[in-house]
Amino acid sequence: MAIFTGAGVAIVTPFKENREVNYEKLGELIDFQINNGTDSIIICGTTGESSTLTHEEHIECIRFAIEYTKKRVPVIAGTGSNCTETAIYLSKEAQVAGADAVLLVTPYYNKATQKGLIEHFTAIAKSIDLPVMLYNVPSRTGCNILPGTAATLVNTVDNIVAMKEASSNIAQVAELAHTCEGKLDIYSGCDDSIVPVMSLGGLGVVSVLSNIAPRQTHDIVAKFLEGDTKGSLDLQLEYLPVINALFSEVNPIPVKKALNLMGFEVGPLRSPLTEMEDAHAKILADEMKKVGLI
């Protein structure tokens, strides 16, 4: 059974002006997502600035999201790390908190070999009794999960069942689907390629766009699954300028700006991330206005 089908939001972590986590605001964001069709909440991922959260904050964000969501949609906890033991610790805490699954990013900076990736993900997955979604984003980690490596993992570790594929390499996604022979659920990790990944058998998207356009992101996937591929593509292309603006600077700088433009008051970023450049922010605002987001 799939962890989820549709559009899952890689939700931001809102901060107060003193940069403490704003849990009240996080609850508002979760309600906004669920009320507008989001199919899953992914907490403490890249978009959630997990790399600048303390372990205590990380675990508390996971606990809060699970308790607040109250099983309305699955909650997937980002628990990956470039330290295997840290990832095991966070994953165990997520299981205790009641997460529906964990999301494990490839180890960053270390640049593990494919053998190292197999050992890393195997150790984490075998430490818990939860479904595991791998997260391949080589542009940020300097490490690429090759299709053969994914096939080895899915064939040897029962609870490794899915991948968020954010390589931006559609040929690699095709090879992944072919090599894993339907045993691995694939989700687009890039908002600009939801439809291409769906056409290769993908089940949906783990989305940044959904933070500001949850209904539309859900509908891109839903239309495709209902057989309305043209409607899905049309909606994907309509929002492409917004998507491009959301990645004109490193994520989550633009999406936090976008949420603040919408009045959500999600607060600042944590250092070393800085506020969006004015020229980029103007383009973002202009594109959001064109589709009625502000």
From Swiss-Prot:
It catalyses: L-aspartate 4-semialdehyde + pyruvate = (2S,4S)-4-hydroxy-2,3,4,5-tetrahydrodipicolinate + H2O + H(+). Pathway: Amino-acid biosynthesis; L-lysine biosynthesis via DAP pathway; (S)-tetrahydrodipicolinate from L-aspartate: step 3/4. Homotetramer; dimer of dimers. It is found in: Cytoplasm. One of its GO terms (biological process) is lysine biosynthetic process via diaminopimelate. GO terms for molecular function: 4-hydroxy-tetrahydrodipicolinate synthase activity. HAMAP family: DapA. It comes from Lachnoclostridium phytofermentans (strain ATCC 700394 / DSM 18823 / ISDg). Gene3D superfamilies: Aldolase class I. The active site is at Y135, K164. Belongs to the DapA family. Catalyzes the condensation of (S)-aspartate-beta-semialdehyde [(S)-ASA] and pyruvate to 4-hydroxy-tetrahydrodipicolinate (HTPA). Its EC number is 4.3.3.7. Transmembrane segments: none annotated. CDD domains: DHDPS. Keywords: Amino-acid biosynthesis, Cytoplasm, Diaminopimelate biosynthesis, Lyase, Lysine biosynthesis, Schiff base. The record marks T46, Y109 as: Part of a proton relay during catalysis. Its main location: cytoplasm. Pyruvate binds at T47, V206. This is 4-hydroxy-tetrahydrodipicolinate synthase. It is an enzyme of class 4 (lyase). GO terms for cellular component: cytosol.
